[in-house]
Amino acid sequence: MARKPPSFEEALTELEQLVERMEQGNLPLEESLKLFERGIELTRTCQKSLQDAEQKVQILLEENSLPTLKPFRDEP
């Protein structure tokens, strides 16, 4: 059975823990690679959650005829 993706908060917490472990610098190469791979998965999960939240906010603003959001910084 497929594992349920973690919530944004769960993914971010796990990602922070992975970074902390890797920054200690005492992991074997193979374990570091596994943690790095997991970190990439968690980063993608967090990015997807943030994109979904941004879209929901945009839809709500449009539905309520509120001014649309402008990018905080130049986005490509």
Swiss-Prot record:
Keywords: Cytoplasm, Exonuclease, Hydrolase, Nuclease. One of its GO terms (molecular function) is exodeoxyribonuclease VII activity. Signal peptide: none annotated. GO terms for cellular component: cytosol; exodeoxyribonuclease VII complex. It is found in: Cytoplasm. Belongs to the XseB family. Bidirectionally degrades single-stranded DNA into large acid-insoluble oligonucleotides, which are then degraded further into small acid-soluble oligonucleotides. This is Exodeoxyribonuclease 7 small subunit. It comes from Methylococcus capsulatus (strain ATCC 33009 / NCIMB 11132 / Bath). The lineage of its organism: Bacteria, Pseudomonadati, Pseudomonadota, Gammaproteobacteria, Methylococcales.
